Every structure is written in structure tokens, then in C-alpha cells.
């Protein structure tokens, strides 16, 4: 089952197909597993800093190895999936990411940590472009925003559980054995992905209806030239803010007197709020539009970070779910807008480019904010994070104007044809 097969229409009338539901569930499961693997690293960073005497900049570099490689391999993974098949690529990438955790558990030096993180980034690069394009192809048309919102929401489900479980395992059996256990979970997930997608019968599992040339279509040229770059820029800033904040949140909590169990609980609370934010903001984006939702989420993110800095540990923990709602809520709006800006035949590449930009920004931002933290301190660096996220607000306003102009032209075209 390849992306090409899933994205190619057949001209048949669309009808309910259990294959669509299976594709969505497998994509959601893969997203939850991979995001759980990725975000468990936040819990390990303070332990590595203590064991290997690392600076904030070095911590940022280690984090960037994983996310940077993951960003760089997004487009190649999507292209390779067209040859090998989506099932094999998703399962194989998951297995590689799991093996990386097994290697993390056996690492005795920073060099081995770096090798394991690079390997994990390669494995995790397969998930986003392949799963997103499969879901968008399976739920073509207006339903794609809701389906992609569900897929995006699923990524936070594992985040709500894995940090707390990992923190408990570290306290009981050490971080090395915990890494091994997480790797075994990943291998089991890889097998489940392969078996589940094999049950979907090749190209007949998902059918994308062909639109006739007479169907009303927006001005794709204008959307690609003007709208998609704006959306990508908003996504880059949003991702850089999220990854920068999450990377240094454990260190901020440490400075407030938090121990490892409290840090694990804090991450779980952020991710729980993030899951709720993705679900709620997906509905808000569909009802209110891009601009009001981005104004709400990004403004609340900046305000939440500013409020968090002076609070004691108890009040900080209570605030974190609210920050999580705002921190992750924007992404549901952004992911769901990609199909509105890109024609179906270019969607796989667009998702690859979008994820390359956003994940790449998430990889680079911890390094830059780490350098700032070493130079000016942790609190001023987090103040900078809060300031930069506000740059998304004028960009969202411009994107809304592009979308409104295209919608106006489409309505005018329809009115002329009626007359």
C-alpha cells in the first residue's frame, strides 16, 4: 500500500469504507507512539546533563541531533514510501526509532548518545509525512480537517502517559534500563503497525474521488505562492517556541526545587493540556477561522510563559495544563489548513516541506535558546521565547487576508456562472 496508490483517484463514487477508518487508527497509533518516543527525551536531558557534565548549549545540540535529522529526512522518507509502501516505511521507521532507544540504554559516552539520537531521528522521520498524507487522502475534502485534527490530537495521548511512566521506571530501575524498556515497546508498536496496515487491501482500501474540471476550485497558484509560505512561517515560529520551552522547562522546574517525579508529572500535565488544546482548537479553527484562533493560542502562550517564571513549584504545576492548551493548540489549526492551500496531487510534498520546516525549527531552537541561556541566564531566555511567539500574530492576519481574497474570487466566479 503506497502513498501513490492512496492518493490516486479512481473515479468511483465515494462510499463508506472500513479501510479509511483503519488507516486513520493506524496513523493515530503511529503518531502517539512516535511522539511518545520523541518527548520522553525531555525527561532524560537533565539526567544526561548531570551524568556527563553538559552545558545548556550541549543539551540543545543533543536535542537538535534527534529533531534535526528527523526534519531533514521528512521529504526523502515520503519519496521512498512511494516505492516501498506506506506500511513498510511506517513499521520500519518505528523499528529504527525503537532500536535507537535500545542503544541509548547502552550508551556510556556522549558520542554514543549522539549516534543513538541520530538513528532515532532517521526512524522518526517516516511518521509525519506518510501518516498525514495517508489520512488526507483517505478523508479528501471538508472531512480532512477533522481527520487531521484527530490524527494531530492522537500524538499527545502517549505524551500524557509516557513521561510519568518513564519517570517511575527511572526511579526504580535507572534511566539506562528504562531506555531499553521503551525500545522494546517501540518494537512491539512497529509490528502492530505492519500487521494492521497489511490488513488494508492495497489501493482499494482508500479511494479519493477525482474532481472534474468543471468542479469549482480555488486559485491554487495564489494559495501556493502567497498562502503556504505564510502558513509555513507561522508553523516554524510556533514549533520553535514549543520545542524551546519544553527543552528548558525541566531546568526551570529544577530551579524551583522540583525533583524527577515532579518534572515527570509536570511534563504529563503539559502534554495533557496540549492534547485538550489540539482537540478544542481544531473545532475553534473550523468555527472561528485561522486568525482568531492563532491570536488566542499564541497570545495565551506568551502570557502563560511570563506568568510561570515567578511562580513557586505548586502554582507552576497548576498552570502548566493551561500553558499546554495554548502551546499545542495552534498546531491543529496549521495542520488542518495545509489541504486548503495545496492541491491533492502536491499534498504529500507539501506535508513533507511543512514538517521539514516545523521540525527543523524545533531542532534548531533548543540550540539557539541554549546559547542564550548560557550567556544571559535561563529566565531571560524564556522571556525571549515568549516575545518571539508574538511574531505569529501579524502573519496570521496576512494569511487570513489571502484566504479571504481567494474565497471572494471563488464566490464571484460562481455568481457570474449563475447569471
Question: What would you call each of these model-derived segments?
Answer:
Residues 151-199:
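Helix-loop-helix hairpin linking two adjacent transmembrane segments in secondary transporters
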Residues 48-49, 80-81, 168-173, 253-254, ...:
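Interfacial helix-cap and linker-helix signal at transmembrane-aqueous boundaries
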Residues 41-42, 227-275:
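Extracytoplasmic gate region of multi-pass secondary transporters
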Amino acid at each position: 500500500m503506497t502513498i501513490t496508490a492512496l492518493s490516486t483517484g479512481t473515479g468511483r463514487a465515494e462510499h463508506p469504507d472500513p479501510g479509511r477508518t483503519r488507516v486513520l487508527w493506524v496513523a493515530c497509533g503511529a503518531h502517539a507512539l512516535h511522539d511518545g518516543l520523541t518527548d520522553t527525551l525531555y525527561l532524560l536531558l537533565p539526567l544526561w546533563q548531570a551524568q556527563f557534565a553538559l552545558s545548556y548549549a550541549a543539551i540543545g545540540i543533543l536535542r537538535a541531533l534527534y529533531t534535526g535529522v528527523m526534519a531533514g529526512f521528512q521529504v526523502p522518507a515520503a519519496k521512498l514510501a512511494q516505492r516501498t509502501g506506506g506500511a513498510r516505511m511506517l513499521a520500519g521507521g518505528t523499528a529504527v526509532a525503537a532500536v535507537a532507544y535500545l542503544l541509548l540504554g547502552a550508551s556510556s559516552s556522549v558520542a554514543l548518545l549522539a549516534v543513538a539520537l541520530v538513528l532515532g531521528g532517521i526512524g522518526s522521520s517516516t511518521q509525519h509525512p506518510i501518516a498525514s498524507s495517508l489520512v488526507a487522502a483517505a478523508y479528501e475534502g471538508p472531512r480532512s480537517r477533522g481527520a487531521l485534527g484527530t490524527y494531530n490530537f492522537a500524538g499527545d495521548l502517549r505524551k500524557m502517559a509516557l513521561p510519568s511512566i518513564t519517570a517511575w521506571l527511572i526511579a526504580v530501575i535507572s534511566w539506562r534500563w528504562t531506555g531499553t524498556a521503551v525500545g522494546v515497546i517501540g518494537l512491539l508498536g512497529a509490528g502492530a503497525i505492519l500487521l494492521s496496515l497489511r490488513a488494508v487491501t492495497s489501493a482499494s482500501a482508500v479511494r479519493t474521488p477525482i474532481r472534474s474540471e468543471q468542479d469549482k476550485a480555488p486559485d491554487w497558484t495564489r494559495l501556493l505562492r502567497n498562502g503556504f509560505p505564510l502558513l509555513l512561517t507561522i508553523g516554524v515560529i510556533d514549533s520553535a517556541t514549543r520545542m524551546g520551552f519544553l527543552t528548558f522547562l525541566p531546568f526551570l522546574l529544577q530551579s524551583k526545587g522540583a525533583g524527577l517525579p515532579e518534572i515527570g508529572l509536570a511534563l504529563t500535565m503539559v502534554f495533557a493540556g496540549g492534547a485538550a488544546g489540539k482537540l478544542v482548537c481544531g473545532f475553534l479553527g473550523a468555527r472561528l477561522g485561522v486568525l482568531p484562533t492563532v491570536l488566542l493560542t499564541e497570545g495565551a502562550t506568551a502570557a502563560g510563559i511570563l506568568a510561570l517564571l515567578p511562580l513557586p513549584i505548586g502554582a507552576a504545576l497548576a498552570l502548566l495544563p493551561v500553558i499546554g492548551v495554548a502551546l499545542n493548540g495552534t498546531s491543529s489549526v496549521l495542520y488542518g489548513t495545509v489541504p486548503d492551500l495545496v492541491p491533492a496531487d502536491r499534498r504529500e510534498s507539501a506535508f513533507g516541506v511543512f514538517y521539514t520546516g516545523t521540525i527543523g525549527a524545533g531542532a534548531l531552537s533548543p540550540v539557539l535558546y541554549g546559547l542564550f541561556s548560557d550567556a544571559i541566564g535561563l529566565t531571560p531566555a524564556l522571556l525571549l521565547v515568549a516575545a518571539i511567539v508574538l511574531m505569529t500574530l501579524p502573519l496570521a492576519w496576512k494569511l487570513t487576508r489571502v484566504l479571504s481574497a481567494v474565497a471572494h474570487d471563488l464566490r464571484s466566479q460562481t455568481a457570474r456562472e449563475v447569471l
